Amino acid sequence: QPGLAHSVHPRVEGLEPGTEHFYRFRVGRELSPVGRFRTLPAAGETPESFSFGLVSCQAWYHGHFTAHRHLAAEEDLDLVVFVGDYIYEYGITGTNLWRQGAEVGEAHRVEIETLEQYRLRYALFKSDPHLQAVHARAAAVAVWDDHEVQNNYTGPLSDTGIGEEDFAHRIAVAYRAFYENMPLDVAALPEGPDTDITAGFDVGALARFSLLDSRQFRDAEPADAAEQQREDRTILGTEQEEWVGERLASSEATWNLLANGVVLVPINEKSTDMWDGYPAARRRLLAQMAEAQNPVMLTGDIHKHVAAEIPADPDEPGEERLGVELVCTSVASDGDGAEDAGTPETWTQHEYVKLYDGRRGYVHVRLTPEEMVSSFHVVDWIEADDTAPKQLTARFTTPAGEPRLIPA
C-alpha cells in the first residue's frame, strides 16, 4: 500500500519447524537479493544449540557498518536481535558526518520530524550493504530505544519541550516509519501515537525470548531523589509488567532472555534514563526474573560493551546473583571509539561488572542446554573505511543454573 510506503509484513504459514529457507522479492522485472532464515524448533523440542547476534546504535553518519560486515559472515547465526537506535533523528552536517567518503543531500541536514523525513532516514541507513547483508543472513527481531523518535523522550513527553499535541504527531509518524521498516507483525501497525511492539517466541524448550518496550510507557525522568524512589514509578507500564511477569512465571525454557533498550544493572543513581532512574520498577522486574530459569537481559544504548552479573538485591548488591546482562556496544555511534572510551571507572568499580570496552562491534551468543557462551567482538576503526578486522575482546561462559560470567 502506498500509505505504508509499499512495505509488506507477510504471515507465512505451513513451514516446517527447524528448517532452513531462502526467499526473495519480485516487483515487475526487479528481483531482490536472496535472503535466508531458519524456522524455530517445534514446541517442546530441545535443539543442540541456537545462536544469535546482538547489535544496537547504528549512527550511519559516524562511520562504516564494519561490525555488520563481520556479523553477516558468522557461520553460526540463527537470529539477529536489534536492541534500539536503529536510526538517529539528528540532522547530518559537516560536524557529525565522520563516515569518510559519504555525502548527504539537503533533506538529511535537519532533524527529522515528518513521516517522509523518517522514511528517508531509514532508507539512508538501510542503503548500507553490510546492514543489508545482515538482514539477508538471518531472521531479525527488534525493539526500539529513544532515537527512533527523539533523544531521551519519555512516554508522551519530548526531551526538548515540544508541546504534547505536536509531539504526539511526531511520535505517530516515527512509530509508523518504524513499523514500515522493521520486522514486526501486522498486529503492531500503529494507531496514531500508540502501538504494541512487545513480542515473544520460544526456541523449542531451549529458550524463551521476550521483547520489551522500555520507552513508550515510562514515567518521566524524576525531578528529585524523592520522586525517583516512588514505588509507583514504571518504565514498562502496568500492562507490560504483567505480560512479562506471566511469560517468566509460566516458562519452562532453560534460558529466559529479555531484550530492552536501557541498562538494567545498578551503575549510577544519576543515570536516570536507565533502570537506575526507576528503582522500584527494577525491583519488580527482578522479582519476576527470579521466577524463571537462567534469566538474561539483552541491552544496548550506551555505545560500550558491558558484561555484568545481575545482583539479586540491586539496592545493596552483595555476592548473590540473579542472572546476567549482556550489553552490546554500538555498530557506529560515537565513531571509532577506544577500549577505555567514556568513564570506565563508573562501571568497573562494581564487582559484578566483568567487561567494559568502548570500541565498536557486536555480541555473538550461543545457547545450548548446558551453557550460554557470549563472545564480544570489536573493531578498531570505522570512520576511515570498512576494512578493520574483528577482534575478540572477551568471551564468557554462563553454565545453566549458575548466574555467572566465567572468562572462557
How should these model regions be labeled?
Residues 1-408:
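Metal-dependent phosphoester/phosphodiester hydrolase catalytic core
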